[in-house]
Swiss-Prot record:
Cytoplasmic topological segments: 1-11, 84-94, 147-152, 202-220, 324-344, 417-462
Biased composition annotated in UniProt, kind: Basic and acidic residues: 453-462
Region described as Disordered: 441-462
Gene Ontology CC terms, in alphabetical order: basolateral plasma membrane; cytoplasmic vesicle membrane; plasma membrane
Taxonomic lineage: Eukaryota, Metazoa, Chordata, Craniata, Vertebrata
Source organism per UniProt: Oryzias latipes
Name listed for the protein in its UniProt record: Ammonium transporter Rh type B
Keywords: Ammonia transport, Cell membrane, Cytoplasmic vesicle, Glycoprotein, Membrane, Transmembrane, Transmembrane helix, Transport
Keyword Transmembrane helix: yes
Length: 462
């Protein structure tokens, strides 16, 4: 027997149908192909400007888009399968909210960045940017993993995508911030938004589900698959929308070496912080990726290979120390129940990346960049602002992002507390059978789960 408060029989279908119908209508009214996608405009441009089809932006951007897309659906999805009885929900809800978010993000980002004569023009770069926005939502999902219903997650995505687009517009367009790999706009925003949401959704009796908030051997192996996909494709993620040529090449290279250095420091710190010297799979799955996060902002800058290795090395150390010592403090003292430890993988490394970006930007000069200064820092090259000014803008952007994320998460958290969204009880968190049909050997466990009397559950949650 299903708990009526968590029964998705009507709530989920109604939510999905309404949201998708609204999206279809808005796309029909507002969205058009851009010049590289529209048959009439593209061929007219080719004839008048002697362009060849191979110069279409698709051929420059689509390989990176493929890598980013795999990261969003496979990387993030499998990274969260570490919970022993929440694998269906980790991958399945990741799939659901990503599919919705990329559509909504296309509209929100298009409204701020791609609006021409009242229409949103989209191409392959729009798809990449929509995936970036989706990544931020999935980071926040990690903080509330196992404690929210799919309807809650969809509504969280509605609000977060909107706030993401506003924050991105303020940083990239109004302030002229450089953040190609999204250390601030994606990772810092998603992490602190999610942390504030999970703080507002604090569950005092979550320890009643503590026995399910852990991994088993095979669930950690599945999570490691997600880690490897993310690790391999992160250079593409950070470089996907940078300028063609040396900035894109440099971003991929800086990320590549940052990840490698981060991995070694992660293994070292994981062993060092254990009394018996044994490695912790949680550290390896997550902290080894922190180098990619930290290299996001400064990746396209002249960070240098050894500089990127220093950044990755520090990111791995910070991330492991966060998992080992800071996460318990956040839960016990600040009542922040961070299921996936997003503060350690995305939050602190994102802030580190923003700081590195600010310092690196402040050191930019014609002597270092040559004619390439115009590609990376056009305002500095034109004399509109000094390198020190650019560094200050980068620092201000971090403060703006933190403010937007924390305030937005606060408001959205209170909205998601409404009982209409069908959140699970404290006693039934981290459990697939609450929302999924489970096969074979899982059925006996589901039967045991549903025998808990409603009044007993109410008592535990009071």
């Amino acid at each position: 027997m299903t708990d009526p408060s968590t029964n998705m029989r009507l709530k989920l279908p109604i939510t999905c149908f309404i949201l998708q119908i609204i999206l279809i209508i808005l796309f029909g009214v507002l969205v058009q192909y851009d010049e590289d996608t529209d048959a009439k405009k593209h061929h007219h441009g080719n004839h008048s400007e002697s362009k060849s089809d191979i110069e279409n932006d698709f051929y420059y951007r689509y390989p990176s888009f493929q890598d980013v897309h795999v990261m969003i659906f496979v990387g993030f999805g499998f990274l969260m399968t570490f919970l022993q009885r929440y694998g269906f929900s980790s991958v399945g809800f990741n799939f659901l909210i990503a599919a919705f978010s990329l559509q909504w993000a296309t509209l929100m980002q298009g409204f701020f960045h791609g609006l021409h004569e009242g229409k949103i023009h989209i191409g392959v770069e729009s798809m990449i940017n929509a995936d970036f926005c989706t990544g931020s939502v999935l980071i926040s999902f990690g903080a509330v993993l196992g404690k929210t219903s799919p309807v809650q997650l969809l509504f969280m995505a509605v609000f977060e995508v909107t706030l993401f687009a506003v924050n991105e517009f303020i940083l990239l367009t109004l302030l002229g911030t450089k953040d190609a790999g999204g250390s601030m706009t994606i990772h810092t925003f998603g992490a602190y938004f999610g942390l504030m949401v999970t703080r507002i959704l604090y569950r005092p009796n979550l320890d009643k589900s503590k026995h399910k908030n852990c991994s088993v051997y095979h669930s950690d192996l599945f999570a490691m698959i997600g880690t490897l996909y993310l690790w391999m494709f992160w250079p593409s993620f950070n470089s996907a929308v940078t300028e063609h040529g040396d900035p894109q090449h440099r971003t991929a290279m800086n990320t590549y070496y940052s990840l490698a250095a981060c991995t070694l420091s992660t293994y070292a710190m994981s062993s060092l912080t254990a009394h018996d010297g044994k490695l912790d799979m949680v550290h390896i799955q997550n902290a080894a990726l922190a180098g990619g996060v930290a290299a996001g902002t400064a990746g396209e800058m002249m960070l240098t290979p050894f500089g990127s290795m220093i950044v990755g090395f520090l990111a791995g150390i910070i991330s492991v120390l966060g998992f080992k010592y800071l996460t318990p403090i956040l839960e016990n003292k600040l009542k922040i129940q961070d299921t996936c430890g997003i503060h350690n993988l995305h939050g602190m490394p994102g802030v580190l990346g923003a700081i590195v970006g600010a310092v690196t930007a402040s050191l930019a000069s014609k002597e270092v960049y040559g004619e390439g200064l115009e590609k990376v820092f056009p305002d500095v090259a034109s004399g509109k602002r000094t390198a020190s000014d650019q560094g200050g803008v980068q620092a201000i952007s971090l403060a703006v992002t933190l403010g937007m994320a924390l305030f937005g998460g606060l408001i959205v958290g209170f909205i998601l507390k409404l009982p209409i969204f069908g959140a699970p009880r404290d006693t039934t968190c981290f459990e697939d059978s609450l929302y999924w049909e489970v096969p074979g050997e899982e059925e006996s466990h589901e039967d045991q789960l549903t025998t808990v009397k409603t009044e007993e559950s109410d008592k535990l949650n009071s």
